[in-house]
From Swiss-Prot:
Superkingdom, natural source: Bacteria
Described function: ATP-binding (A) component of a common energy-coupling factor (ECF) ABC-transporter complex. Unlike classic ABC transporters this ECF transporter provides the energy necessary to transport a number of different substrates.
EC number(s) stated in the UniProt entry for this protein: 7.-.-.-
Name used for this protein in its record: Energy-coupling factor transporter ATP-binding protein EcfA1
Family according to the record: Belongs to the ABC transporter superfamily. Energy-coupling factor EcfA family.
NCBIfam families (UniProt xref): ECF_ATPase_1, PRK13648.1
Major localisation: membrane
Assembly information from the UniProt record: Forms a stable energy-coupling factor (ECF) transporter complex composed of 2 membrane-embedded substrate-binding proteins (S component), 2 ATP-binding proteins (A component) and 2 transmembrane proteins (T component).
Species: Clostridioides difficile (strain 630) (Peptoclostridium difficile)
Amino acid sequence: MDNIVKVNNISFEYITDEAKLKAIDNLSLDVKKGEFVAIIGHNGSGKSTLSKNLNAILMPTEGNILIDDMDTKEEERLWDIRQTAGMVFQNPDNQIVATIVEEDVAFGPENLGIEPKEIRRIVEESLKSVGMYDLRDRQPHLLSGGQKQRVAIAGIIAMRPKCIIFDEATAMLDPSGRKEVMKTIKRLNKEENITVIHITHFMEEAVEADRVVVMEKGKKILEGTPREVFSKIKMLKEIGLDVPCMTELSSLLIEEGINISSDILTVDEMVMELCQL
């Protein structure tokens, strides 16, 4: 399977009058087409800085990033790169630009010079894909947080990306809104084969990924399947990260002498395990 993202030994420094802060330190990462990768790490680990480098908002100080074989340092490819790898930010209000939902989703295709008839078809498809078509005439400020974020996702989908980067896109949402957005993310990945890079601090969201990457002090310190990564409970806690609730619970039950698996990730898995006792 081909890689859509290749991060080659990148470093990134924030430079101020007082000092240089290395936010990413010699990091490499490949993401395959159609893969769902979650990137986790506590505040200051470099994960959001990485996401902005992937979308060419920031440029690596060292190394390079290829998005579908396009180098993010090539200014003339910037528009193509951002169309290929769209980005959804933490606050949907910062990404919504129009006063009507369908007009907001149409904004990107209009700037591509697409014919109006084709734009209408794209907008309809994009809104239906995130379950927001029935609210196409609504004003965005009247929507819930989860609905706004789905409109922002529809706006990215309308650009026909091969990859979407979610930079803590659920962080400002309540549990219901997070559930809405995660359902949308999973459907886009599994049904439309859109590559997903999901930066998050919610471990239950990372469980949904094909692969989890753990960052600490700008470095990639661990990666693997969710089951492999979250089995390292002690290591994760030492760097200030939690593990999924059911993984934590299974660890506590094992300490109490209950004979269950140590790599449980979800409620359903816990129920099945306990029913076998």
